Amino acid sequence: MISDEQLNSLAITFGIVMMTLIVIYHAVDSTMSPKN
C-alpha cells in the first residue's frame, strides 16, 4: 500500500515532469515551425 507521503511526492514529481515536457514541446514546436 502506498503511503500519503509517497503518493504526494509522486504526484508532485509527475506534475513537474508533465509541465517540463509541455514547455519543451511548445518551445520546440514554435522553433521548428515559426508562425508567419
Curated annotation (Swiss-Prot):
**Which InterPro entries did the record assign?**
Oligosaccaryltransferase, Ost4p_sf
GO CC aspect terms: endoplasmic reticulum membrane; mitochondrion; oligosaccharyltransferase complex
Its UniProt pathway annotation is: Protein modification; protein glycosylation
Known outcome of mutating M19L: Disrupts interaction between OST3 and STT3
Q: What GO biological process terms are annotated to this protein in UniProt?
A: protein N-linked glycosylation
Membrane protein topology class: Single-pass type III membrane protein
Reported effect of changing I24D?
A: Severe growth defect
The domain of life for this entry's organism is: Eukaryota
Effect upon mutating Y25D = Severe growth defect
Subcellular location(s) of the protein: Endoplasmic reticulum membrane
Q: What UniProt keywords apply to this chain's record, in alphabetical order? A: Endoplasmic reticulum, Membrane, Signal-anchor, Transmembrane, Transmembrane helix
GO molecular function annotation: protein-macromolecule adaptor activity
Coiled coil region boundaries: none
**Where exactly are the transmembrane stretches of this chain?**
10-28
Query: Lumenal side: which ranges?
Result: 1-9
Q: Does the keyword Zinc-finger apply?
A: no
Q: Which residues lie on this side of the membrane: Cytoplasmic?
A: 29-36
Q: What is the effect of changing V23K?
A: Severe growth defect; abolishes interaction with OST3; disrupts interaction between OST3 and STT3
Task: Quote the function comment for this protein.
Answer: Subunit of the oligosaccharyl transferase (OST) complex that catalyzes the initial transfer of a defined glycan (Glc(3)Man(9)GlcNAc(2) in eukaryotes) from the lipid carrier dolichol-pyrophosphate to an asparagine residue within an Asn-X-Ser/Thr consensus motif in nascent polypeptide chains, the first step in protein N-glycosylation. N-glycosylation occurs cotranslationally and the complex associates with the Sec61 complex at the channel-forming translocon complex that mediates protein translocation across the endoplasmic reticulum (ER). All subunits are required for a maximal enzyme activity.
Q: How does it assemble?
A: Component of the oligosaccharyltransferase (OST) complex, which appears to exist in two assemblies comprising OST1, OST2, OST4, OST5, STT3, SWP1, WPB1, and either OST3 or OST6. OST assembly occurs through the formation of 3 subcomplexes. Subcomplex 1 contains OST1 and OST5, subcomplex 2 contains STT3, OST3, and OST4, and subcomplex 3 contains OST2, WBP1, and SWP1. Interacts with SEC61, SBH1 and SSS1.
What family is reported? Belongs to the OST4 family.
**Other information:** Present with 2430 molecules/cell in log phase SD medium.
The protein depicted here goes by the name Dolichyl-diphosphooligosaccharide--protein glycosyltransferase subunit OST4
Gene symbol? Answer: OST4
